Amino acid sequence: MAQRVQLTATVSENQLGQRLDQALAEMFPDYSRSRIKEWILDQRVLVNGKVCDKPKEKVLGGEQVAINAEIEEEARFEPQDIPLDIVYEDEDIIVINKPRDLVVHPGAGNPDGTVLNALLHYYPPIADVPRAGIVHRLDKDTTGLMVVAKTVPAQTRLVESLQRREITREYEAVAIGHMTAGGTVDEPISRHPTKRTHMAVHPMGKPAVTHYRIMEHFRVHTRLRLRLETGRTHQIRVHMAHITHPLVGDPVYGGRPRPPKGASEAFISTLRKFDRQALHATMLRLYHPISGIEMEWHAPIPQDMVELIEVMRADFEEHKDEVDWL
């Protein structure tokens, strides 16, 4: 059943020059800016008694605003006692270090057992925030840092920060192949035309930019540090595969394990057992959505990636004299 929403207020003189959707988001902080924008486009907002369907319309201050809308009841998700590795928490945000094998949001094939279910158990009031405060995601088997909003105002501002590319996210990865230099992949990404669960570089896709630099060379693999400008689904995985250096272990965009000639049994065994993309969100930097203070967190790579890198490093040292690019 839909919930009726009827709101009235007067635009403050201090809001002179703001976009209508921005002004209303400040006036009604219990509702996200994206929701308010939908109401404006749906002609649910009156300004001085007249319908206004332009979110970008500038306000002058003093206008009488009325909203008459409905909110469809969202799917109800159950709280579940799933441990969360909390790196930081205050009244407005939570930063977690997500493990592998944990989906962020319920969906097809994963109706529960997700970060969202864990958040509902850990902090029940987060149920009042759209999507339980989740503003960005990590793939199921990508580990590392992600930020969650505990309130609607915090969520609104974090989403705006993401859109303005003010949140810095850096990753560590291990890619297949010897890479000679860092660089940037600036290629649009969209759904794969035939494999609907896959993404692909496509000229009609959404803009996507990934910067990468080399941290360490191995014989036939490369350890990378990457920074996202955008946050498309599977972005790093798709971009690295596009430049013919897919991530080790990637079950979708990678290839079969390729140990170098003469590799030890330990190397071969570790590589074959590594059954996820070698990708970890290692650094997160943002401006706090309420205080505006710049904050930064780091999460070391998990043990499975540590072991992978150690066997690759040992193999490189053992066969250094055979490498032709040194």
UniProtKB/Swiss-Prot annotation:
It catalyses: uridine(1911/1915/1917) in 23S rRNA = pseudouridine(1911/1915/1917) in 23S rRNA. Keywords: Cytoplasm, Isomerase, RNA-binding, rRNA processing. SMART domains: S4 (SM00363). One of its GO terms (biological process) is enzyme-directed rRNA pseudouridine synthesis. GO terms for molecular function: 23S rRNA pseudouridine(1911/1915/1917) synthase activity; RNA binding. The active site is at 139. Responsible for synthesis of pseudouridine from uracil at positions 1911, 1915 and 1917 in 23S ribosomal RNA. This is Ribosomal large subunit pseudouridine synthase D. It comes from Escherichia coli O6:H1 (strain CFT073 / ATCC 700928 / UPEC). The gene is rluD.
